[in-house]
Amino acid sequence: EHGEPAHIVNTSSGNGGVSPLSGTPQYAATKAAVVTISECLYAQLQEVEAHIGVSVLFPGPNILRTGLFESWRSRTDEFAKQRPRKTPYTTVEQLEAQMKAAGREIAYTPVEEVAGVVVDGILADRFWMMPASERGDETMRLRYESMRSRANPSYLRQVPG
């Protein structure tokens, strides 16, 4: 209404936004939805010549220490599970141990780097806020080639477990 420029940044993930990890279908599906909704919103705002930018942030290229694995601890009683879990929640320490057991080191991206990607992306009015990553670029290329050639997915990765 005011005509002032604005910018919306929606957060996705390489897990789902680029290609899913096979062991996390619910998470991957929501992150794929973030990308699609953002693309549609971008197009809709362009059609009405709104001065509102839209971006999709892919934080990373590695894991961020955001507390995601401990988010269940702050769940209020209102949103508590009606049936208790049969298995405990996975901790970041358990994920690190699983990765190490699978021969893969877990790497972290400082949140300050992600903040820089966001600020630079907003200033450049960039839709894709994606830090450089050889692994990510290769996954995108393989997914594109799979789709283009109508081949079965060969780019999918599994969560070590």
Which residue stretches match the model-derived regions?
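A short helix-coil junction within the Rossmann-fold of NAD(P)-dependent oxidoreductases
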Residues: E1-P5, E47
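Rossmann-fold scaffold of SDR-type NAD(P)-dependent oxidoreductases
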Residues: N10
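Residue(s) in the substrate-gating loop at a strand-loop-helix junction
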Residues: S13
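Active-site loop immediately N-terminal to the catalytic Tyr-X3-Lys motif
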Residues: V18-P25
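Conserved cofactor-binding/catalytic machinery of classical short-chain dehydrogenase/reductase
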Residues: P25, A33-T36
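Active-site helix of classical SDR
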Residues: T30
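Conserved alpha-helical elements of the SDR catalytic core
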Residues: A33, C40-L41, L45
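SDR active-site lid
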Residues: Q44-M129
